[in-house]
Amino acid sequence: MVEYKIYIPDAIPDKHKRISDLIQRKYNLKVKKYTSAKKIAQDYGQAIFELMNEAYQPLYGYSALSQRQIDQYVKMYLPILDLRMVTLITDADDQLLAVGISMPSLAEALQKAHGRLLPMGWYHLAKTIFLKKYPKMLDLLLVAVKPEYQNKGVNALLFSDLIPVYQQLGFEYAESNPELELNGKVQAQWEYFKTEQHKRRRCFVKGIK
């Protein structure tokens, strides 16, 4: 598994802009944004995690979310997201094709809290999540694209919407999730950004005699 530090560009990369404009016209795609957690949960809460299951199912080690887990995640996590950092891509019939979800990194808040919620650790987390006192780093929590739309440039449309948001909120770089070293599809997303591959995880097996 590898992870990347991805620097937020000063402007949307030209190729991203061209591809996103082309793809949006060619497939009649729509960019959807929400300001209400209740509304996005009603309209697309279930669909977001069903899309995640569909897009991630071929990946080694992925276990599909159960209906109970999906219900829990919709209830617990959507309300704490800054919806400016959530972008949905739909077709002309409003069917969900892609989603990009990111949030401010909680690493700095957890360090200040020394990994504890009590007595005052909760304050540092609440300041980041609810008071919008954001650090310089954001976490790319989830990027999922319907399999039949992968490798067609839909990711460029997601980031063409999100990059200006990241700039507006003062983020300087993003942290990717752990990625399989051989997952060329996801790593191709970062081709047009300045990146550092700064973390690597390995598992080793040794027989016991």
Describe the predicted segments one by one:
Residues 1, 189-200:
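Conserved acetyl-CoA-binding loop of GNAT-fold acetyltransferases
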Residues 1-35, 204-208:
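Acyl-donor-binding surface of acyltransferase catalytic domains
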Residues 3-5, 88, 101, 175-176:
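Short beta-strand segments
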Residues 5-8, 145-150, 176-186:
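Conserved beta-strand-loop-alpha-helix junction that forms the acyl-donor binding cleft
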Residues 33-145:
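A conserved beta-strand-loop-helix scaffold within acyl/acetyltransferase catalytic domains
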Residues 116-129, 157-166, 176:
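Low-complexity, glycine/alanine/valine/leucine- and proline-rich hydrophobic stretches
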Residues 125, 137, 141-145, 150-164, ...:
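Conserved acetyl-CoA-binding loop-helix of GNAT-fold acetyltransferases
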Residues 137-138, 166-180:
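Conserved GNAT acetyl-CoA-binding A-motif
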